[in-house]
A protein has these predicted regions:
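Soluble catalytic regions of large protease machineries
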Residues: 3-158
């Protein structure tokens, strides 16, 4: 749902049907990689949205979202490498790149950015709660929603 809000029309299918041991999921409509830092951080935000949605609807933290958190953590490692997410402060010589100090610095930045993106996902869901609930209702009724179904639901919630 967050993906559809951030990039309308980008979600091809949403389902609650199981596949290869995973219950439910969604597929992006296009198979392109993030072209810039903003798009990349949108991907991390979408990854954290499931956990944020459970918190918003049920008022509890989703302790079963470990796979999502692990994926977000991996994406943040990529962000730090490819988009200089750790900044240039404290960069050490090549001989000392993996020092404890540098790793600790990077983990603190990554943790803060994950927290920021989680709050962003929560805010998007909160601001679009009627859309979220309508998608939830549609999935309960039909089990699978296509891009066209999401567009109709979104139109009805505006």
């Amino acid at each position: 749902m967050v993906g559809e809000v951030l990039h309308p029309g980008s979600i091809g299918i949403v389902t609650v049907r199981g596949n290869q041991g995973v219950i439910g999921g969604m597929a992006n409509g296009c198979a392109t990689y993030a072209q810039n830092e903003e798009e990349f951080l949108d991907e991390v935000t979408k990854t954290l949205a499931g956990r944020a949605g459970v918190s918003l609807i049920y008022g509890v933290m989703d302790i079963q979202a470990s796979a999502d958190i692990e994926q977000a953590d991996k994406l943040m490692d990529i962000w730090q490498c490819h988009f200089a997410g750790g900044g240039f402060v404290g960069i050490e010589s090549g001989d000392n790149r993996m020092s404890e100090q540098r790793l600790s610095y990077n983990e603190a930045i990554k943790s803060a950015k994950l927290e920021e993106l989680y709050r962003r996902a929560y805010k998007i869901l909160h601001n679009n709660k009627y859309f979220l609930l309508a998608v939830q209702h549609g999935l309960l009724e039909h089990e699978t929603l296509l891009n066209s179904d999401l567009a109709k639901i979104r139109e009805s919630c505006i």
